[in-house]
Structures are given as structure tokens and as C-alpha cells.
Amino acid sequence: MPQKLYIETFGCQMNEYDSAKMRDLLEVSDSFELARSPEEADVLLLNTCSIRDKAQEKVFSQLGRWRPIKLRRPEVVIGVGGCVASQEGEALQKRAPYVDIVFGPQTLHRLPSMLEQVRCERRPVVDVSFPAIEKFDALPEPRADGPKAFVSVMEGCGKYCTFCVVPYTRGEEISRPVDDVIAEIVALAEQGVREVNLLGQNVNAYRGVLADGGMADLALLMHYVAAVDGIDRIRFTTSHPVEFSDALIEAFRDIPQLVSHLHLPVQSGSDRILRLMKRGHTRAEYMAKVAKLREIRPDLSLSSDFIVGFPGETDEDFEDTMALIEQLGFDQSFSFIFSARPGTPAAAMADDVPPETKRARLARLQAKIADNAAKIGASMVGSIQSVLVEGTSRKNFNELSGRTENNRVVNFAGHPRLIGQFVDVVITESLPNSLRGRLIGVAHESDFISPDSTAQIA
């Protein structure tokens, strides 16, 4: 009988990608199948994130919930991976001695052998090393899970922003060879994937080796991706403004598959705070890049990351951020109150912004983003949008759900056979977190099919 695997994932899209690879590795090597709950699992894996406040506490809280399972069934193996595991290493296992495996983002490919070692030797295994590109060489064949997929093209970051742990937990920048990336995307396209999201902690810094020994940047890589049969949409994340080159801007002009949506973290609109964060760019430089992009793609939607209450942030600094949001019209964001990450330079700075001030600033910022989003959503009502149908609606299984090019969720009535297809939907209503629409046609192999004909689609 197959063993059961349960994976809990905290954090970013890269962690989601890594968790999917853990699942694939163990399904291939040890014939595991996914458990519906931790209680029925033989192996419990926690893939952790160290970006947000109290990341360690969240990890140990989750492990505490799993501890009774281990006490009842000592043969259950508990593993902790991801960035907190990389930070804590052996200290994590000492604090939670019932944890059997501690592994970093760059050693997840060793999970099958670590699992075998734990079971044979009956002692914990800790491996948080950084074995460069080896991780990608050892991963199983890609497996599609719906019409869109994440594809990791590089890992790590060498920017060392003062608030960020990524260089310490994911290591320096490592790019996959171009042929390896394209082979993975071809395999996914053959399984029905229509949209790929190219991932990296600093994806703009991609420098992959070509078959002839040359080097490809992200712009060139996306030209190769666009040539893959079946891939109709390309996204990429996460970007650093410093690495956003003219070649990358020109890719928005030359590659129609590249969507008119960009996540470009700025963190703050204050030059003084940007210097303290060691971001390497100014407010004006950031705005100039966005202006160039919007000359090429006037309908480009923009999302960002913001940190409020960074050490030393004054009212004036915060107002600079609010003004930037107003000027550039960000309509989506990941925004957080500053919390010091252990071992980073910002952790040594005086955290002198009162908690109540931080909370008030965050509330104002998020309200402004929500207001921008509402205005853009309202402006889309009556428009016809191309939507990639991802599945059924989370709130109504009788409806379908998909995303527009500008990353808006749209729910509408339609036949489940449309999942995985691009459809044309007229937007009828804008809601706080989604849009509602009416199906008006299906784009299928370059033909237009009316809604009455959707039963013909296999």
C-alpha cells in the first residue's frame, strides 16, 4: 500500500514550486501519495518562509500541532525545509527533537535519501548546505497541475538589502541553463500548460548558459519561452528594479505572450529610506523605468511590495510612499510592517517607529491600494477580457474561474470542459477581490466558438 505524504507550505511562489517538487520526488522514488490530513500521513513536511514577522514562532507552533501525531505514531517522519530551516539548521532540531529531517531550499532533491537514512539509522538528518545547481539536475520530470505552472529559472540573490534574509537562506544567484528551462516548459506545454510564471528571488538577474557556451539574460530567455508551442502567456517574478534592463523593457514590446502586468517591488517611495534599505536605486529611477514600460504598454498594471515603519521612517518618508502609489497607480501589493530578521543589517538599526504608527500607516497604505484596485476594476466593467480558465470557482462549484492578463480573478458561468482554455468574457461586475463576467466566446486553436458550441470542446 502506498505511503502517505502531507506537505504544509508557508510563504512565496518559490516555496509552492519547491513543495510541488518534493511531492514529485517522493511519488517517483518511494511511491508516495498525498494525504488529505496530517493525521493520516506517514511523512509530514513543513516548507517554511522567513520573510514575515515571527516566522520562527509560526514554524514551531505548527510543529507543536504535529507533535501529538509523532507521540502516537513514532514511526511518522517529520521534516522541515525552506528558509527557516536554512537559518536555524541544527538549532531547529535541538529545539524540536521530534523533528527527523532538516533541509534547506538547495537540498530538497536529497529528500528520498535523507528519508531512507532516517529510517535505516534511526537518527535525525540535517542538511542545509548550498550545492549550487545540483538541486535542479536531480529533480524529476515536470508534472502539470492545471493550465498554468511555475518554473524556477534561478535562485538566490546577491543584492543584500538590509532587511532581507534571502541571500543568507537561499544563497547567491544561481541560474539554470537555458536548455534545461526550455525542456521543462516544453514538457509542461505537452501536458496542457498554457501559462508559465518564471520564478527567481531576483529573476531579472537571470544569466543562463546557452548550448553554444554563450549567456542569455531574462529577456532572451523569454524569447525562447515564447517560441514553445502552446505557451500563450508568460509572467515572471520577483523583479528587482536595478536589474530591470532596457532589453527587458523592450521584451514587453517584442513578445506578445508577455502579459501586461508586472510585479516590481519598490518597498518605499522615500529616497532616504531606499538608501537605508540598500536598494541601489532612487525613486526617480524607479519611476523612469515604469514610464518607459508604459510607453510600450499603456495598459500595464503594476503591483509592488511595501515595507512600512522601517527604522527611521518619518511621516515625510511615508508620505513619499503614498505619493508614489498615487502617481503610479499600484493596484495590488504585498505590504507589511517592518520586523527585524535575525542576522540582517536592519536588525541592528534602532526600531524607533512606534507600533501604533506602523499599524496606522499600513492601514492607510492598504486602503489606498484597495481604492486604486476598485477604480481599475470598475473601469473594466463592460470590457471584453481574455481569460485563462483555471478551474471551478472556490465559492461556487457551478461556476468557472480564471485570470485576466492583468492578473484579475474572474468568475463566470461555463462548462467544465472549458478548463485549460482561453475564453472571451465580458466583465459585468467589479467586486473587492474579483470580477464577475459573462462568457461570450471561446478561442480554440485560433477559431472563435460561440458559448452555444462549448459542448463540442473535449
Curated annotation (Swiss-Prot):
Q: Which SMART domains match?
A: Elp3
Task: Detail which positions bind [4Fe-4S] cluster 2.
Answer: 157, 161, 164
**Domain Radical SAM core: residue ranges:** 143-375
Q: Does the keyword Cell membrane apply?
A: no
Where does the MTTase N-terminal domain start and stop, copy by copy?
3-120
Alphabetically, the GO molecular function entries are: 4 iron, 4 sulfur cluster binding; metal ion binding; N6-isopentenyladenosine methylthiotransferase activity
| Function summary | Catalyzes the methylthiolation of N6-(dimethylallyl)adenosine (i(6)A), leading to the formation of 2-methylthio-N6-(dimethylallyl)adenosine (ms(2)i(6)A) at position 37 in tRNAs that read codons beginning with uridine.
Q: What is this protein called?
A: tRNA-2-methylthio-N(6)-dimethylallyladenosine synthase
